[in-house]
Each structure stands twice: as structure tokens, then as C-alpha cells.
Amino acid sequence: MLNILMTHLINPLAYIVPVLLAVAFLTLIERKVLGYMQLRKGPNVVGPYGLLQPIADGVKLFIKEPVRPSTSSPFLFLAAPVLALTLAMTLWAPMPMPHPVTDLNLGILFILALSSLAVYSILGSGWALNSKYALIGALRAVAQTISYEVSLGLILLSVIIFSGGYTLQTFNITQESIWLLIPAWPLAAMWYISTLAETNRAPFDLTEGESELVSGFNVEYAGGPFALFFLAEYANILLMNTLSAVLFLGASHIPSVPELTTINLMTKAALLSIMFLWVRASYPRFRYDQLMHLVWKNFLPLTLAFVLWHTALPIALAGLPPQL
């Protein structure tokens, strides 16, 4: 009985609660970073140095009355944000930090499949609101997400050929001699840009173009449901950066100090997340056709070429992983 309780309740909770806390403070870091980049302080009133701001934001959002447009679809209106957050939390299950909640043989495929399902929550919310702005925003988001998933999938395939397995733990073993960032740096660059687009972040945040779309597919959401979307979006950002750290920034343990494994991975993921914020502060939004041109005309041919190249390399080098 205790075993079942541990596996099905305590373990998932011990995973979900820290992720949600990290998401809350990622919003604070974002506001602080953007503030300092614009030569201002950012949140500094609630608590010391504004540290309690995320808690105040969360309380404020969840005690607001959830207003629902009278013409919207009641079930879909609530189901979409719940689905978004559920998927965002489930995606963390196979992440090796250093031990995953569910040790899957095909962890990478699981992440790829579930991140594709997130499209349905966006589409559902855009359609349920019965508003033309929300629908256009949702269609943009869906087109963008599924386009960039093509390049993400091909990049993953190339990297999997290097590591020789679909489990995320094998990447730690592969990269004990050298980070995959070094032999596969063009893939790492394309992967990072694709994760920016996949998570709808600036400069790819076309779904939230205030000037033309009044904030996109979550335009009519307020209070609790909006907070769920918000949490899901930032959880996905953290997940993508943790995944980037596992895939390209290698073995999360230093052989001499194995105790630092988790801190090591967290530091890499946090630095990558701060780069997300840096990009947001630096670049203006793309035009929609440029966004699509980038993935279909630039990334797709390049990633296909790299898949061929990475297939040829292990055959030529007797299946050895990259080494110094």
C-alpha cells in the first residue's frame, strides 16, 4: 500500500511542486532581467527585493472571478487550460534529474509526442472563445508549433544517432568525454532557435501580437484559467531548456563530485532560460512569413542534410560516440 502511495502520489507531487515553484520564480527573474535591461528596477515592492511578487501574483489571479464569455463553449473553455497544464507537468516525467519519475525506454519520443498534443489545448481555447482574434491567434500558434516540430524531430534524430539510444540517460554516458554541443554545434543552434519558436517566445511570439491580435488565443481568459495557461507556458520553457541541457550540455555529473549532479543540471537549465529572456529583451518580433520561411526553407534542408551526415559518421567510425 505504501509502495503504491509513493509511486502514484508522493513521487509525482515531489516532482510537480518544485516545477511549479520554479515557474513562479522564473516569471520574477524575467521581470527583473527585462527591467535591468531597460535600466529600471523591475518588481521591488512586494517583499525584500520583490521576492514575494510571484506569490502575490498567484494569489491575485486565483481569487479573481473567472469570467466566461456568454457565447463561448463552457466545457472547452475550462478543459483547454487544464489540458495545457496537465501536459506540461506530464512532460517532466522522463527527465533524468538525475533519476526520472518514469524510466521510459523511449523517453525522447514520449516528450516529442506529448509536446505535439499541447497544440490541441491551444486550438481548443482559440475555438472555444468564439472570438475571431482568439481563433486567428490559435491558428497561428498551431501552424508555428507543428512547423517547428518537424525541425525539432529531425535534430533529435541526428543527436540520437550520435548517442545510440532513445533514453535520456544514455546522453549522460555519451557525453562523458565531450559535450555534444561541440561536434554538433549547428544542430544545437538550430535546436535552440526551434525551442524558442516551439514555446511561442519572443521573437517568435506572433500568437500574442498585441497590435493585431489583442494578446492571442488566451484573450478572454482571466483569473484561474489564465494562470493555468501561464504556468503551462513557463513550465514548457523550463522543460525545453532542461532538455537542451541534457542533449547538448552533456553529462550532468562531474565524476569526482557526483553529489552536484542535480545542481549542475539546474544551473545549465537556468542559464539557458536566462538566454531566453535575453533574446526577448533584444529582438523585435518576426513577420509571420519570415518565421515560416526560416523553418521550411532554411532549417528543414539543413537538418535533413545533418541526418544524412550523422548516419554516415557512425558507419565510418565503427559506431563510436564523439570523443576528444
Swiss-Prot record:
Q: Which UniProt keywords apply?
A: Electron transport, Membrane, Mitochondrion, Mitochondrion inner membrane, NAD, Respiratory chain, Translocase, Transmembrane, Transmembrane helix, Transport, Ubiquinone
**Keyword Calcium among UniProt keywords:** no
Q: Chief localization class?
A: mitochondrion
Instruction: Give TM regions.
Output: 9-29, 75-95, 106-126, 146-166, 177-197, 228-248, 259-279, 299-319
Which Enzyme Commission numbers does its entry carry? 7.1.1.2
For this chain, one GO molecular function annotation is:
NADH dehydrogenase (ubiquinone) activity
Q: Name one Pfam family in it.
A: NADHdh
Q: Which GO terms describe its cellular component?
A: mitochondrial inner membrane
Q: Provide the reaction this enzyme catalyses.
A: a ubiquinone + NADH + 5 H(+)(in) = a ubiquinol + NAD(+) + 4 H(+)(out)
What function does the entry list?
A: Core subunit of the mitochondrial membrane respiratory chain NADH dehydrogenase (Complex I) that is believed to belong to the minimal assembly required for catalysis. Complex I functions in the transfer of electrons from NADH to the respiratory chain. The immediate electron acceptor for the enzyme is believed to be ubiquinone.
State the family it belongs to: Belongs to the complex I subunit 1 family.
Q: Which HAMAP family match?
A: NDH1_NuoH
| Designated name of the protein | NADH-ubiquinone oxidoreductase chain 1
Q: What is the lineage of its organism?
A: Eukaryota, Metazoa, Chordata, Craniata, Vertebrata
Q: Which gene encodes it?
A: MT-ND1
